[in-house]
């Protein structure tokens, strides 16, 4: 059960770490949470949803074109992690904007937002690449690469 501390610890344990570790599990959970909210709102366009979402409302303005696409609400795990990385950065941008509102140096805020914007743009390009790799099964014949290496 994920609502119990023992269940949460199992999810965050070694067998469930995929790419970089437990951070990827968190990115996946971010995506799942946002996708659930999108389903409830009956909204499939990511930019439209983020523009109305409290934690990303102003940051979404930086991505009028970049995030203006329909999200498949049943993504594979790898894509959930990629989307979570994007969403995490957009939320961080919102927090950065709020820091600027409270008087933090505007030049540092502007620089930070530019860096995050470029990072999100780059990650969206990777995310939107639809070339999904698949498992190759029964590849025994002709697959011993050592046979093709000159010693």
Regions found by a protein language model. Name each.
Residues 1-151:
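Flavin-dependent oxidoreductase catalytic core characteristic
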């Amino acid at each position: 059960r994920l609502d119990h501390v023992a269940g949460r610890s199992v999810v965050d344990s070694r067998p469930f770490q995929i790419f970089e570790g437990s951070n990827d599990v968190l990115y996946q959970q971010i995506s799942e949470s946002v996708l659930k909210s999108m389903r409830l709102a009956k909204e499939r366009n990511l930019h439209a949803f983020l523009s109305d979402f409290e934690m990303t409302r102003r940051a979404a303005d930086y991505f009028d074109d970049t995030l203006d696409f329909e999200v498949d609400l049943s993504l594979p795990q790898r894509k959930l992690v990629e989307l979570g990385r994007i969403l995490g950065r957009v939320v961080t941008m919102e927090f950065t904007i709020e820091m600027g509102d409270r008087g933090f140096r505007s030049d540092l805020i502007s620089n930070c937002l530019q860096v995050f914007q470029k990072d999100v743009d780059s990650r969206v390009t990777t995310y939107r690449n639809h070339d999904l790799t698949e498992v190759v099964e029964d590849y025994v014949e002709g697959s011993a690469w050592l046979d093709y290496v000159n010693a």
